[in-house]
């Protein structure tokens, strides 16, 4: 809901009535999703999930790019169908890429946070990303998924796989299984347990390349402008 609230706060002046009504519906759907996930986490209400960040986060299997030895990391919990996540990908991520990732100043990692109630096709898109990992093409698929929202049918995903040079038979067989759904939902549950109310959700922290453990420094709960990331990342780099 943080991203939705941010959009209402920053864009209400130019939004149509239908757009505002849709945002309200998104908020209600996300509340329902959070309540359902809270039950899976032990019956706590959504408000009770807002808590301090954990002392450590295990990121052993998280796809990453940037410096393999950097001790400062940016972790994104995101949804391939979320409009605010897509906006971040198209407008803010290129600046982060150029300023921090391509220059090997930080390690950037991606984690799953699909919200089924808002985006029914999203879980399938996240499964496709995991299937691409099997053929060492995660980032190629990741980029295709964010630039083709709303077209995450099995046929469309197979077309994306062909575009990036995957073995489409192996890929199609992979997305037809359910072997990654549990880990994707665990990632979503973990994000909510940290107080994430919506997507995207980011954490900047100190990373140990040997143990793959992240010590969180600061959470960024929403699709904020590059300047917000710059301020927090620069502070972390100055104190590494």
Annotated model-derived regions:
Residues 1-2:
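Bacterial N-terminal signal peptides that target proteins for export
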Residues 12-14:
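N-terminal Sec signal peptide cleavage junction
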Residues 16-24, 28, 159-240:
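C-terminal cap of thioredoxin/glutaredoxin-like
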Residues 20-47:
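Post-signal peptide N-terminal segment of mature Sec-exported envelope proteins
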Residues 56-72:
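A short beta-strand-turn-helix
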Residues 70-73, 103-107, 135-140, 166-170, ...:
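Loop/turn elements at helix/coil->beta-strand transitions in domains of secreted/extracellular proteins
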Residues 77-79, 111-114, 143-146, 176, ...:
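Active-site-proximal beta-strand/loop segments in catalytic clefts of secreted hydrolases
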Residues 80-162, 235:
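Structural alpha/beta surface segment adjacent to cysteine/selenocysteine redox centers
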